[in-house]
From Swiss-Prot:
Annotated Pfam families: RecA (PF00154), RecA_C (PF21096)
Positions that bind ATP: G67, P68, E69, S70, S71, G72, K73, T74
Listed GO biological process terms: DNA recombination; DNA repair; SOS response
UniProt family annotation: Belongs to the RecA family.
Gene Ontology MF term list: ATP binding; ATP hydrolysis activity; ATP-dependent DNA damage sensor activity; damaged DNA binding; single-stranded DNA binding
Protein name: Protein RecA
Compartmental location: Cytoplasm
Top-level taxon: Bacteria
GO cellular component annotations of the record: cytosol
Length: 354
């Protein structure tokens, strides 16, 4: 019978072989906090950047963001574009849904004058354009909105009642086989937005599935499930959504982390709201009753007033964000411990304190 030491050696050899064959990050311990040294683009949400383990979405990889309608998928990707443009990166948006609003994009901080936009006629054209942009090596971030709208040419040219079983899945599988190597070589981030469908006849387990077959699930290094969990109200008026994102797959750090943040209408992700929540959670912002204090100074009664103070003092907000980013990305064990402690205290999640 093999000893513990022999088993550990055999396991280490097996893990080494798997990583050699399938790439680093293809297998890891669930509690492993070690992240790969990969260049990342911020999502615009500090808590999501921390949950991803590397400070954002990984360059040179495929990412899938999926969720129900109006859950914040496009808002999140536009936020990624805004952050990438701040770093001088070139971005492209392949709008297969023909629904991109330039005014809304500009409100989220996107430089619409520098953003490359394509509205293709069919799925083949969209993926060929994506392939050409990746091969150029000059584009850093490409968003495809959405997989469900990548309609094969044969379906568009056919009759309404014609059956086109598996056409889109085959199209995606072929395109991803072609794209994946080029994406790695050009160090380009390609984000596919996807929609949710219900599987018919599922009695047990989750009936939800994403469109476009299974290929994207395999090729994606990161998969994010985004959901709206509630409304944010100011009096009787609804001013935004409470949003929850779960990292359902992550090949560059530990998966299955979950974060909550707010998306405000016309503004996008509420950065000041996140700073207050994370600041309190990691003891950089003090909370006594309804009062919030930062650096020993009271900054507001109630979360809305504390957020307003940070908006009026951008230098203090930037200093707090820098402190949090440096501390949490450098100490992922602390993040994991804080998440476990929070889950033990309450399973209700974050609530809007307005």
């Amino acid at each position: 019978m093999a000893t513990k030491e022999e088993k550990n050696k055999a396991l280490a050899a097996a893990l080494g072989q798997i990583e050699k064959q399938f790439g680093k990050g293809s297998i890891m311990k669930l509690g492993d906090t070690q992240a790969l040294d990969v260049e990342a683009v911020s999502t615009g949400s500090l808590s999501l950047d921390v949950a991803l383990g590397i400070g954002g979405l990984p360059m040179g990889r495929i990412v899938e963001i999926f969720g129900p309608e109006s859950s914040g998928k496009t808002t999140l990707t536009l936020s990624v574009i805004a952050q990438a443009q701040k770093e001088g990166k070139t971005c492209a948006f392949i709008d297969a849904e023909h629904a991109l609003d330039p005014i809304y994009a500009a409100k989220l901080g996107v430089n619409v004058n520098e953003l490359l936009v394509s509205q293709p006629d069919n799925g083949e054209q969209a993926l060929e354009i994506c392939d050409a942009l990746v091969r150029s090596g000059a584009v850093d971030v490409i968003i495809v909105d959405s997989v469900a709208a990548l309609t094969p040419k044969a379906e568009i040219e056919g009759e309404m009642g014609d059956s086109h079983m598996g056409l889109q899945a085959r199209l995606m599988s072929q395109a991803l086989r072609k794209l994946t190597g080029q994406i790695k070589n050009s160090n380009c981030l390609v984000v596919f937005i996807n929609q949710i469908r219900m599987k018919i006849g599922v009695m047990f387990g989750n009936p939800e599935t994403t469109t476009g077959g299974n290929a994207l699930k395999f090729y994606a290094s990161v998969r994010l499930d985004i959901r709206r969990t509630g409304a944010i109200k100011e009096g009787e008026e609804v001013i935004g959504n409470e949003t929850r994102v779960k990292v359902v797959k992550n090949k560059v750090a530990a998966p299955f982390r979950q974060v909550d943040f707010q998306i405000l209408y016309g503004q996008g992700i509420s950065k000041t709201g996140e700073l207050i929540e994370l600041g309190v959670k990691h003891k950089l912002v003090d909370k006594a009753g309804a009062w919030y204090a930062y650096n020993g100074e009271k900054i507001g009664q109630g979360k809305a007033n504390a957020m307003k103070w940070l908006e009026e003092h951008p230098e203090e907000a930037l200093a707090l964000e820098t402190k949090l980013r440096n501390e949490l990305l450098a100490n992922p064990e602390k993040v994991l411990a804080a998440d476990i402690a929070e889950k033990n205290e309450s399973s209700t999640g974050l609530e809007a304190d307005y």
